[in-house]
From Swiss-Prot:
It comes from Proteus mirabilis (strain HI4320). Residues 109-241, 292-304 have a biased composition (Basic and acidic residues). GO terms for cellular component: cytosol. Residues 415-584 form the tr-type G domain. Its main location: cytoplasm. This is Translation initiation factor IF-2. Residues 470-473 are annotated as: G3. Keywords: Cytoplasm, GTP-binding, Initiation factor, Nucleotide-binding, Protein biosynthesis. Gene3D superfamilies: P-loop containing nucleotide triphosphate hydrolases (3.40.50.300), Putative DNA-binding domain, N-terminal subdomain of bacterial translation initiation factor IF2 (3.30.56.50), Translation factors (2.40.30.10), Translation initiation factor IF- 2, domain 3 (3.40.50.10050). Residues 277-291 have a biased composition (Basic residues). One of the essential components for the initiation of protein synthesis. Protects formylmethionyl-tRNA from spontaneous hydrolysis and promotes its binding to the 30S ribosomal subunits. Also involved in the hydrolysis of GTP during the formation of the 70S ribosomal complex. Residues 424-431 are annotated as: G1.
Length: 916
């Protein structure tokens, strides 16, 4: 081993080089930084350090003795007090915890080492046994193979000798025959020679084949013997492993014995309690129960029976006494569980108390109350834990029956118009582009020039029919934009040539990819001088949108919504993409579709915009939309004209539903209105039960959160909008504004005008009413004025979110910052009869002002914090002393001012906070 230097040794043990050199010197070894260190010198240094530690070590045990002497006056004989000397001795022993811990650690290490050695010995014995079994099996296989080979060789040798003997006899017979026909003609002799040669060749070939067959047979027997030996070795190894595992399993003996001991204890308890009852026959031994939840109840009943017999020992037993025999075994029931069930109902079905179910759930790690609703999986686990059989029931059988009882046409699917969604960033010209196609002015009618709900339009062009969905581009309408991507066939991504790719553009690409919908890019505002289409292509290529001229699959069309440039090319690209997709739908039969948008009209009631997917929607049909149902009383297209029917890819507004459906719900035409009502009510109840079942359980982290709820400010809001989709978008945007200090709570939201109920709710809960494109009626305005409720109207979502954000910022607690104004050094201390100790100071930094909070610093440590009571300069009271001047300072309620102290004057500044 090569020696290392002092420097490298210091780096290795992570200690300063100078300290290591000094330690070598203390140990009697003179070294420099570059000198080498041998192993012997290292050991010498280590011994010196250990001896040094031992010399300075503390004693392991310390005993303290204390004596307390006192006198006690006690009354004596003759009325005189007598003094008695009392001595109290106390002895206390203190043990060094480090020594005890070291001893325990040493014992633990010794036990671990013994356990490790035992395990290693067992593993070694197991390995040796396995190797021994394997060697024996291999030797046995080798012996069998050699014996088989030897037998095969002997057999082949015998057969070869027999063949040789037969050949000799044959040659002898041929020689005799040859002598017989020696006098025959020469042609006959030639023929005999040929025959002889042929027979010899056949015999040689036969001999070769025989030897080959014998060799193959010997090899096969050897292979079979080796395989047999290998299997025998594996069986021995498995047997050894199973024996070892059975020995290991033997350590769980205490589990089973404890169970048997518990059963025996139950039986002995029953016998003892039964023996207490006078006049009662001996109780037969009870068979072992298979339900562990009834053991405690059995013991309690046995004790109760013993107590009752003990109380009535003097009472004569009646011959007509009604008896009750407790079931000998637990009753396992078939429990039918629906999608949701309360704890009380589950207990009734299992015929047990609700407290037993709650105990079982607590053992499983879940807290529950008697009225809490459980989901199907939780109820199944609880019932199976209590030993019952569970039968899961589907509660949507009626819904499936209604959906199956529909007239769907068996006709062939025909081509339908493509559903095209126009997506893009806000103000990139989506609605203006659709305007030019429809030759209308929709954008001018939008508040603030931005689209705030989905517009569905069916457009007939010279090239064909197209259904357009115009989605908002604002960030708050993410859910609406995602909903548009789910029902569409083609996405037209509008990107402004002068603005490029923006956040909502990226989001639209993600929605289109998630829905697996092809994209056609419309580069808008191409007529502007600062337009840069190549920049748009480059930015979109980073997100997987490659143009066709770059080798991609996406069509890029340059358009101008103002001048109408490229509109025909865009329509051609859309219809070309639709032909590639081969969009088809069944035109006849009961219709089905999707709710695009819904709102509450004051004169017409609930109105829903439905995009038909297949079938034909007729006036008078019974429609089931999510939680709502109804018969179609009227049907209008996007232009407001009455229509009698609508085919696939047609958007229509329908009237006649029971309430406003949620946007995105499936709309299905059914046969029976009564069954449709039952399905709608079932869905409402199921939604409520599932919502209750998903309530947060009581966990430790929630307890702390609930404890701090009182410190959180709340802003209550009642929100009313014109359409359902806008209500969802604004709700999501407002909820995201909540912080840990200010919580925004939407206590009521809906579609339609602000009613008297909304105003009463806001007044009772101290809430703000927000109206988005809606107004309050006369009765609501009267209550709002009487109760002084804050009512605000909005038509653009930007201003709504900004004002709510500023209101929440006002509810935040301000931050307080301390600003140091001046610093004075104490040069001398004077005594004043009025103020006590007066510090004669020199202002070294800033200014000193009267009545400001101060800190007294001694050696840069704060020793007092209070208020400046007196500030004088040459016996005159002053309000301020500037830098470089002398002054006298009196600190309120503090007299321990010393020369050299620093007096720091500061002020507290309040800083308003805002929500980002």
């Amino acid at each position: 081993m090569t020696d290392e230097t002092v420097k490298s040794l210091a780096e290795e043990i992570q200690t300063p080089v100078e300290r290591l050199v000094q330690q070598f010197a203390d140990a009697g070894i003179k070294k420099t930084v570059s000198d080498s260190v041998s192993q012997k010198e290292k050991e010498t240094l280590l011994a010196w350090l250990n001896r040094d530690k031992e010399s300075t070590s503390q004693p392991e045990k310390l005993t303290l003795q204390r004596k307390v002497r006192s006198t006690l006056s006690v009354p004596g004989t003759g009325g005189k007090n007598k003094s008695v000397a009392i001595e109290v001795r106390k002895k206390r022993t203190y043990v060094n915890r480090d020594a005890v811990e070291k001893a325990q650690a040493a014992e633990q290490a010794q036990r671990e080492a013994e356990e490790k050695a035992r395990r290693e010995a067992e593993e070694k014995a197991q390995r040796e046994a396995q190797e021994k079994a394997q060697r024996e099996a291999e030797e046995k296989a080798k012996r069998e193979a050699e014996e088989a080979k030897k037998k095969a060789e002997e057999k082949a040798k015998r057969e070869a000798e027999e063949a040789k003997r037969e050949a000799a006899e044959l040659a002898k017979r041929e020689a005799a025959e040859k002598d017989k026909v020696k006098q025959n003609e020469k042609p006959k002799a030639d023929k005999a020679d040929q025959e002889k040669a042929r027979r010899i060749a056949e015999q040689a070939e036969l001999k070769r084949k025989t030897e080959e067959a014998q060799r193959r047979k010997a090899e096969e027997e050897a292979r079979i013997a080796a395989e047999k030996a290998r299997r025998l070795a594996e069986e021995n190894a498995e047997k050894w492993t199973s024996d070892t595992s059975s020995e290991t399993e033997g350590t769980d003996y205490h589990v089973t014995t404890s169970r048997y001991a518990r059963d025996a204890e139950d039986e002995s308890d029953a016998e003892v309690e039964g023996g207490r009852g006078r006049g009662r026959a001996a109780k037969a031994p009870r068979p072992k129960k298979n339900n562990r939840h009834s053991e405690k109840a059995d013991r309690e009943e046995a004790r109760a029976a013993g107590r009752s017999n003990k109380k009535g020992k003097g009472r004569k037993n009646s011959t007509l006494q009604q008896g009750f025999n407790k079931p000998a075994a637990a009753v396992n029931r078939d429990v039918v569980i629906g999608e949701t069930i309360s704890v009380a109902d589950l207990a009734n079905k299992m015929a047990v108390k609700g407290s037993e179910v709650i105990k079982t759930m607590m053992k499983m790690g879940a807290m529950a109350t008697i009225n809490q609703v459980l989901d199907q999986e939780t109820a199944q686990l609880v019932a199976e834990e209590m030993g019952h059989k569970v039968i899961l029931r589907r509660e949507n059988e009626l819904e499936e029956q209604v959906m199956n009882d529909r007239d769907t046409s068996d006709e062939m699917a025909v081509s339908r118009a493509p559903v095209v969604t126009i997506m893009g960033h806000v103000d990139h010209g989506k609605t203006s582009l659709l305007d030019y196609i429809r030759s209308t002015k929709v954008a001018s009618g939008e508040a603030g020039g931005i689209t705030q709900h989905i517009g569905a339009y069916h457009v007939k062009t010279d090239k064909g029919e197209i259904t357009f969905l115009d989605t908002p581009g604002h960030a708050a309408f993410t859910s609406m934009r995602a909903r548009g991507a789910q029902v569409t066939d083609i996405v037209v991504l509008v990107v402004a040539a002068d603005d490029g790719v923006m956040p909502q553009t990226i989001e639209a690409i993600q929605h289109a990819k998630a829905a697996n919908v092809p994209v056609v890019v419309a580069v808008n505002k191409i007529d502007k001088p600062e337009a840069d289409p190549d920049r748009v292509k480059t930015e979109l290529s980073q997100y997987g949108i490659l143009p066709e001229d770059w080798g991609g699959e996406t069509q890029f069309i340059h358009v101008s919504a103002k001048q109408g440039l490229g509109i025909d090319e865009l329509l051609d690209a859309i219809l070309l993409q639709a032909e590639v997709l081969e969009l088809k739908a069944v035109k006849e039969g009961m219709a089905s579709g999707v709710v695009i948008e819904s709102y509450l009209d004051k004169g017409r009631g609930p109105v829903a915009t439905i995009l038909v997917r297949e079938g034909t929607l007729n006036k008078g049909d019974i429609v089931l939309c999510g939680f709502e149902y109804g018969r179609i009383r009227a049907m209008r297209n996007e232009l407001g004209k009455e229509v009698q029917s609508a085919g696939p890819s047609m958007p229509v507004e329908i009237l006649g539903l029971s309430n406003v459906p949620s946007a995105g719900d499936e709309a299905t035409v059914v046969r029976d209105e009564k069954k449709a009502r039952e399905v709608a009510l079932y869905r409402q109840g199921k939604f409520r039960e599932v919502k209750l079942a998903r309530q947060q359980k009581s966990k430790l982290e929630n307890m702390f959160a609930n404890m701090e709820e009182g410190k959180v400010s709340e802003l209550n809001i009642v929100l009313k909008t014109d359409v359902q989709g806008t209500c969802e978008a604004i709700t999501d945007a407002l909820v995201k504004l909540s912080t840990d200090e200010v919580k925004l709570k939407i206590i009521g939201s809906g579609v339609g005008g602000i009613t008297e109920t909304d105003a009463t709710l806001a007044a009772a809960s101290d809430a703000i009413i927000l109206g988005f494109n809606v107004r309050a009626d006369a009765s609501a305005r009267r209550i709002i004025e009487q109760e002084s409720v804050d009512l605000r109207y909005y038509s653009v979502i930007y201003s709504l979110i900004d004002e709510i954000k500023s209101a929440m910022s006002g509810m935040l607690e301000p931050e307080y910052k301390q600003e140091i104004m001046g610093l004075a050094e104490v040069r001398d201390v004077f005594k004043s009869p009025k103020f006590g100790a007066i510090a004669g100071c020199m202002v070294v930094e800033g200014n000193i002002k009267r009545n400001n909070p101060i800190r007294v610093l001694r050696d840069n440590v704060v020793i007092y914090e209070g208020e400046l009571e007196s500030l004088r300069r040459f016996k005159d009271d002053v309000n301020e002393v500037r830098n470089g001047m002398e002054c006298g300072i009196g600190v309120k309620n503090y007299n321990d001012v010393r020369v050299g102290d620093m007096i720091e004057v500061f002020q507290v500044i309040e800083i308003k906070r805002s929500i980002d």
